[in-house]
Amino acid sequence: MEISYYELLEITQNADKETIKKAYRKMALKYHPDRNQGDKEAEDKFKLVNEAYEVLSNDEKRAIYDRYGKDALKGGGFGSNSSGFGGFEDLGDIFSSFFGEGFGSSSRRRKSSNDEKIPSDFIFNLKLSFKEAVFGCKKNIDFTYKCSCKTCNGTGAKDGKLQTCPKCQGRGQVGVSQGFITFAQTCPDCQGSGEKASEKCSDCKGLGYNESKDSVELNIPEGVDTGMKLRVNAKGNILKNGTRGDMYVKIIAAEDDTFIRDDDDIYIEFPVFFTQAILGESIKVPTIRGEATLNLPKGAKDGQRFVLEKEGVKDVHSSRMGNQIVQISIKFPTSLNDEQKELLEKLSESFGIKDGMHQEQKGLFEKITNWFKS
């Protein structure tokens, strides 16, 4: 079932124009491509939100939509404005009207020819074992960085000469039609600069940069985890002016077969024999640093959790220690010899279990029988 324009903007059908405008601003920000790079679902939602606003902000189109539905607006029902934004030249303009020049019109979104073709910083993904992440380690890594081409001054053009991009006519953006709406996107030929090399630099093959290799020894601190980033100063890309950015090392920590990590806490499921759970006992359990004593109380239950304080991971930013949580799994024998079977039968009888039924079970059956008789 197709979602309505009102549902897309999360408003009621009697919403006024100001409410529609505020709702559009909220949803457009939520699904804007700059905030959801690579998210196809968000991109589709963004297009639908713009489509909904275009209709509901126009009294005539809204009236047609309310009465006949979306299909009635197809086939020229949107008037003569081919942009589909009712007076806005492109997507940059519509955002500029709502959010100010920070989102930029088409002229503001165009990159300057003086812009760098490479960012100063970059991310390096570093895989660590479970133990390396928990206890820290030293790592020698080899990496590749980019250096702005000196031959063309980072332009990618022979002799550094650029011409106006013929595809976007120097605007840095091109229009892409989606049904009855035209969206603006960065020009694929000039990457938004509005300028293009008439002849590529032979040194960098038109890229504007060359690649070089480097290496560095890293001291990985104790307690890092997946997603954390460590900054390595002055190991990033080299820009036109000679400034070198930073490299950010992103940690990807492996999982362990025995221990489960949740931030600084460690979880483990540990088997306990049923007699140990019934009688209570001090048992040894493995920890990330060796072993620790767990005092099982009498009558411990299957799945019950116990906390071993400060047996977890050290916090990467302080001296605080996490805990280890032990969840017990009660195990029962799968086979018995004659002596064991006899002992268990005697134990069962000592608890008042006769004819395969415990006294509490008998009481329940009697209660149900009386219920049927009443």
UniProtKB/Swiss-Prot annotation:
Domain of life per record: Bacteria
A GO biological-process term: DNA replication
ZnF (CR-type) residues: 136-213
PROSITE patterns attached to this UniProt entry: DNAJ_1, DNAJ_2, ZF_CR
Residues engaged in binding Zn(2+) 2: 165, 168, 187, 190
CDD domains: DnaJ (cd06257), DnaJ_C (cd10747), DnaJ_zf (cd10719)
Family, as annotated: Belongs to the DnaJ family.
Protein name: Chaperone protein DnaJ
Lineage, top ranks: Bacteria, Pseudomonadati, Campylobacterota, Epsilonproteobacteria, Campylobacterales
